[in-house]
Design a protein with these regions (language model features):
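Conserved catalytic core of nucleotide-sugar-dependent glycosyltransferases
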Residues: 1-64
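C-terminal catalytic/acceptor-binding lobe
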Residues: 51-162
Length: 162
């Protein structure tokens, strides 16, 4: 696992004890709810990672941070199942708690392989309709890293004051 970072999309445990993959057609199709890595994390992740987990948007920020820190990010959620044991619909957050903006979010789509596949990465930047995939996504995130600093610090401040 050295230099790898697994981001897992959750499987919801339903009231009848069945599991449902949390990848609906339109909503939250790119969520990551659990992470597996071999410590220590890169210094950049520790320095910039001062935000609360569980806030809307934090999962995309974690993927972005891992990517710009040089880790190989992948999501083998079709074979590694992170079970979500939260049957209540109650949440302590809403849309206004969303952290950041697209420039500091990345997504890694689920698959059935336990190996790095850059084609599963997506980065939205600038206008939300601009997207890059694969190696281009990694390169764009690295190219825009310093220009995105203001977005990053705004997201951290917002997280800490809500």
């Amino acid at each position: 696992l050295s230099e790898h970072f697994l981001c897992l999309t959750r499987w919801d445990l339903m009231r009848d004890n069945t599991l449902r993959f949390k990848q609906p057609a339109r909503i939250r199709k790119n969520s990551h709810d659990a992470w597996i890595f071999k410590p220590p994390l890169p210094a950049k992740m520790l320095e910039k990672g001062g935000f609360y987990m569980g806030r809307p948007g934090c999962d995309g920020m974690v993927v972005y941070l891992a990517t710009i820190s040089g880790l190989k990010v992948f999501n083998p959620s079709e074979v590694v199942k992170a079970k979500h044991l939260h049957l209540s619909g109650h949440r302590t957050y809403g849309r206004r708690h969303r952290m950041g903006r697209d420039d500091i979010y990345m997504c890694v789509f689920p698959n059935d392989k336990i190996e790095f596949d850059p084609s599963k990465l997506m980065y939205k930047f600038g206008d939300p309709r601009q997207r890059a995939y694969g190696e281009e996504a990694i390169q764009r995130a690295l190219d825009f890293e310093f220009g995105n600093e203001k977005h990053w610090y705004y997201a951290i401040e917002k997280c800490l004051r809500l």
